[in-house]
Amino acid sequence: MKVLVVFIFCLVRSTFGQFEVPDALVEVFRPRGLRVSIPDQEGIKLFAFHGKINEEMNGREGGTFSRDILKAKNGRWTFYDANARLKEGDILYYWTYVDYFDGKNKLGYPNDDQKFVVKQLLDKDGAAPSVTPPTVTKAPPQEHTTLESGCKASVTTKVNERVCAGEQIFHEDFTTFETNIWRPEVKFADKPDYEFVFYRAGPPNLQVKHHRLTIRPVPSDAVFGEGFVSRREKVNLAPACTGVHGSIECVQTPGAFLILPPVTSAQISTKGKWSFKYGKVEIRAKLPKGDWIYPELYLNPVNEEYGPGYASGQIRIAFSGGNEDLCRDLRGGCILGSRPAARNYAVKNIVKNSGSWSDDFHKFIVIWKPDQITMMVDDQVYGNIYPPEGGFVSEAYNLDLVNVERWRGGTSFAPFDKEMYLVLGVGVGGHCFEDRSDATKPWTNNDPKSQKKFYQAAAQWGATWSNASRLEVDYVKVSAL
């Protein structure tokens, strides 16, 4: 009898203890802005929102609005799009999804076929919505990695999970700085580019304001005081250092011709937080202007499975030197190694007829496929990259590549066949600029005194730096193929 009672209790608990997706609160603001949120509950690990305006969803498609929210704020899991413009009478069709951990397993719970009719636009003052959220409909739990019916499988993966074709898998509009998505680097720059930079988190180098990310390079002496770069004492960035502890990324001591980096800047990435393989990346940004400054809009390998540095490749979404004689030339593509030939072999470029790429905002686009990479700017294709017969490894001798034998174990597109993460930053100097014979470049790349020589030429390059010497990023989007 006792066993029977226990069995009945467990059955009742299992039947009636099923998780229910919380009601979604929909708020539409004037003149623009859309916020959809659910209350936080213990066990919720992810909230996803997918929606369209005045168009019904085709099953669980990605939709016009599509985002995974990875962290609750102020007691709610919140999707917010500051640019969404809706009017009274519009209908928002949507579905939501929650990853829920019950103490043993993480299961996915969708809430399908929802709609919200806009009856009133709200001021951005936290006013209550005029329409009661729709009643939740129970749905059986599903594993998050299982593709739903009506979903066409994509070759794209995000964080090693399969996704639906055409789905928007990442969207950042910098409403706030999301530390659960972005990791600010705190380190001294080192290989493979040896830029003359000390990466810091926070002002004056890193700011998120007015829905834009701004990264600005600033001379180190202006931040820490005159003579900072050559003071004879050890500088240890631990425990905040994001580089390899104990290495020159975290600890440096000036002496003789060795100085600390003469420029402070910032670099953020989704390393360890979010990654993907294959897809369309779109970044709307204004590039920095000024001598020896360049944008760092990259895709870097997550695990460096083919080896350290460029042995595992890098995809450059947009690169343009800030010098007057370089800023008309936009370059993007695949970096195969640190030598000039390997840096240029799989890179495409487009030259602006007038003005520079840093004069205004542009859309920089990369379409990364298993056998091809397409480079675009403002929806114009300026290059396609294909692997040679035998793969990139077949060019090892011609390009003076080292430590690339592991590529033979990958696809013909190796090393560009592994998950990568996003990088946004600003670099200065280093090996990204080829040596010149006309003495207009104040250092040579293999000179151990290169950083000091750059610093000694500060009056020359500093005169070209201005308020335009900053990278401004409006948004970052990634969509599945």
Curated annotation (Swiss-Prot):
Classification via Gene3D superfamilies: 2.60.120.200, Beta-1,3-glucan-recognition protein, N-terminal domain
Main localization category: secreted
Alphabetical GO biological process terms: carbohydrate metabolic process; defense response to bacterium; innate immune response; regulation of innate immune response
Source taxon at top rank: Eukaryota
InterPro entries in alphabetical order: BGBP_N (IPR031756), BGBP_N_sf (IPR043030), ConA-like_dom_sf (IPR013320), GH16 (IPR000757), GH16_GRP_C (IPR035806), Glycosyl_Hydrlase_16 (IPR050546)
Pfam family, any one: Glyco_hydro_16
Tissues showing expression: Hemolymph.
Mod. after translation: The N-terminus is blocked.
GO cellular component, one term: extracellular region
Glycosylation sites: 467
Residue ranges of domain GH16 in the record: 211-481
Location within or outside the cell: Secreted
SUPFAM superfamilies associated with the record: Concanavalin A-like lectins/glucanases
Keyword annotations of the record: Glycoprotein, Immunity, Innate immunity, Secreted, Signal
GO molecular function: carbohydrate binding; hydrolase activity, hydrolyzing O-glycosyl compounds
Leader sequence segment: 1-17
Residue intervals of the CBM39 domain: 19-123
Family per record: Belongs to the insect beta-1,3-glucan binding protein family.
Role description: Involved in the recognition of invading microorganisms. Binds specifically to beta-1,3-glucan and activates the phenoloxidase cascade.
Protein name (Swiss-Prot/TrEMBL): Beta-1,3-glucan-binding protein
Organism from which the protein derives: Tenebrio molitor (Yellow mealworm beetle)
UniProt lineage: Eukaryota, Metazoa, Ecdysozoa, Arthropoda, Hexapoda
